[in-house]
Design a protein with these regions (language model features):
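Adenine-nucleotide phosphate-binding core of ATP-dependent small-molecule kinases
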Residues: 176-181, 274-315
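Nucleotide/phosphate-binding catalytic cleft detector across ATP-hydrolyzing
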Residues: 1-16, 20-74, 79-204, 248-249, ...
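Residue-level signature of catalytic and energy-coupling elements of molecular machines
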Residues: 10, 19, 77, 173, ...
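Short, surface-exposed connector motifs at secondary-structure boundaries
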Residues: 151-152, 220-223, 314-321
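Acidic, glycine-rich loop-and-beta core segments that form the ion-binding/anion-interacting portion
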Residues: 195-264, 268
């Protein structure tokens, strides 16, 4: 009996590394193993310590191997959308065979021709996704193999990223003893599971509240049109709690998960919990509403930053609405807070598969789902047709347009990739700026309560 095709997704996140193992059984993905390990080798989505990242990858893979009872050798790796560019590309060749029948070799050659374009030396091609083939002027062809023709043309989407970042990811995966089967841009992976086909077609905003950064993406006509990365995420919420309550990061994370609300309207001011305060023998009592206001302040800042970027491309004019996922979105009230700030009805996505019922698994799950749905022609173009003999869904289930849509280059924050902001010299200054704001309401209350607690 032939074993079903196995897919392994690797999500190297700022706060954790996650692995999902899935099998394609009767054109359905079955999750057979998962792994999760705390990550200490990344900062704001950037690998800063290769050895620690390798250790986290090995641990997560080992967990997934034990649960799935298989040996993992090859993984599909998610790539964050920091400084990712998606551009249309075009290639044309003469069909090589004497009988003019288009073969796998011709598909590979026309893709190579599409790659022949000026790519800056600091960037690297991550993948090229075929969208439409043209044979002797006849367009709209999804798979030209077996057809007779003289001229073969290809319209495709070329995805490029910073060479240094891609190299660091490759280095970590290879040092962990694994082979990279393919790369998948994380917003595309998230969209594969978090959005319906209609939502991807009509136009929908997808927000991923990660640990080290938050990403707002726009999917339209089945393609990624726009992506913006804010270098703040759930980890910054934890740091705020740690700084303001004068407690350790581990305590702050535990407090956030056990007592935290993303909206102060949902929390109760008469519910108290103990906080182990640095420099004091006895725990300090803090009410849930105060904690919620600390969390809400940071999430509000993240949402407002994402809104400014989305307003620039008029993303809110699209009819698909807003979908929110990612680890930080699991805090009660995160969706309602987004609705009030962004002015759109929002839907919360969490994987429904057993073992994955946490939004922090969305990307890893999306990676395997995206890879499984790629048509066979994609793998042929990459020269890997023998590795994927049974695609999860037939090619006609994929949505293609007769011409590749014009891609809007992803927009990014003014900060350089992996660089500290020049506006503030340290994280503490940012927190002080939040606390010392001249605005009334929450900020004034924070100042007053801090004085009461620590004076």
């Amino acid at each position: 009996m032939v074993r079903p095709k196995t897919y392994v997704g690797l999500d190297i996140g700022t706060t954790s590394v996650k692995v999902v193992v899935a099998e394609n059984v009767n054109q359905r993905l079955n999750i057979i193993g998962v792994g999760s390990q705390r990550s200490e080798g990344l900062s704001r989505g950037v690998i800063v310590d290769i050895d620690k990242t390798v250790e986290a990858i090995r641990s997560a893979v080992s967990q997934a191997e034990q649960k799935s009872n298989i040996k993992i050798n090859e993984v599909i790796v998610g790539v964050p959308s920091n400084q990712i560019n998606i551009e249309p590309c075009y290639g044309m060749i003469a069909v090589s065979g004497e009988n003019r029948e288009i073969t796998d070799k011709d598909i590979h050659n026309v893709l190579s021709a599409a790659k022949v374009r000026a790519v800056p030396p600091e960037r690297e091609i991550i993948s090229v996704v075929p969208e439409e083939f043209i044979v002797d002027g006849f367009d709209g062809i999804r798979d030209p193999r077996g057809m007779i023709g003289v001229r073969l043309e290809l319209y495709a989407s070329m995805i490029t990223g910073p060479k240094t970042i891609i190299h660091n990811i490759k280095r970590c995966v290879e040092k962990a003893g694994l082979v990279i089967g393919d790369f998948v841009v994380q917003p595309l992976a998230n969209a594969e599971v978090a959005l319906s086909e209609d939502e991807r077609d009509f136009g929908t905003i997808l927000i991923d509240l990660g640990g080290g950064q938050s990403t707002a993406s726009v999917l339209h006509e089945g393609q990624l049109k726009f992506s913006y990365v804010d270098q703040e995420g759930g980890e910054y919420v934890t740091k705020d709690i740690s700084t303001i309550l004068n407690t350790t990061l581990d305590n702050a994370e535990r407090i956030k998960l056990e007592y935290g609300y993303a909206s102060s309207k949902k929390a109760r001011p008469d519910e108290y919990f103990p906080v182990e305060t640095i420099g004091k023998k006895e725990p300090t009592k803090v009410d849930e509403q105060y904690l919620a206001e600390i969390i809400e302040a940071r999430l509000q800042q993240i949402y407002e930053t994402l809104k400014k970027a989305l307003d620039q491309v008029e993303a809110f004019d699209l009819p698909g609405g807003l979908v929110i996922t990612g680890g930080a979105s699991s805090l009660p009230g995160a969706v309602e807070l987004a609705e009030s700030i962004l002015g759109e009805e929002a839907r919360f996505y969490i994987p429904e598969e057993v073992g994955l019922r946490n939004p922090s698994y969305t990307t890893a799950y999306g990676i395997v789902a995206y890879a499984a749905k790629l048509p066979d022609i994609y793998h042929v173009a990459q020269g890997r047709s023998k590795q994927v003999k049974q695609p999860l869904h037939p090619t006609e289930n994929r949505s293609y347009e007769p011409k590749p849509a014009d891609h809007v280059a992803p927009s990014y924050s003014e900060e350089g990739y992996g660089q500290e902001s020049t506006k503030e010299n340290s994280y503490e200054k940012k927190v002080k700026q939040l606390i010392s704001s001249e605005d009334g309401g929450f900020m004034q209350k924070v100042r007053n309560i801090i004085d009461d607690i620590f004076n």
